[in-house]
Amino acid sequence: MVRAFTLWYARLLSWLLASSVAVLIVPVSLQIFSRYTQLIPAYIWTEEMARFLFIWMVMIGAMIGVREGSHFEVDVWPELGAKATAALQLAASAFILLFAFVFLWAGWEFTRFAWNRVSELADLPLWMIHVAWPITGLTWFVFQSERMWDAAMVLAGRAQPKAEAKHLEAAE
């Protein structure tokens, strides 16, 4: 049940990321056209909207990256066995959980700071942008906990190691 939820959530995030890329084209295109032609007036708010969308795109991409385990790795040791690899994954995952906690806690403070403020040009509540940090931290925590569970099961001898691509299809 938890895997089904995380799979659904990962798919939702992927859809949101693709949608935000498509939506980002609108304010950026308006800004370009208004800068080089007299056909439309200069829209000052488009730069701010593009920046806000870009922030969300980066955060959603980071969430998906943790789910897929697509962050970079540096191989220091030669090929290790399944249990040793799982132990190293658990150790590395602890650091990712630490960063998730920092994003969650500091992001919440960041959001509270912006709660009653609005952006200058687009007149949007700033908490809508700042809430990306705690949501990212919480999402990292959920996705990384799932990955840690898989590594713990391999370490305990209850499961075989999964290839990264198969990890995503585990709930299907």
Residue ranges, per PLM feature:
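Alpha-helical transmembrane segments and membrane-interface helix-loop junctions
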Residues: 1-172
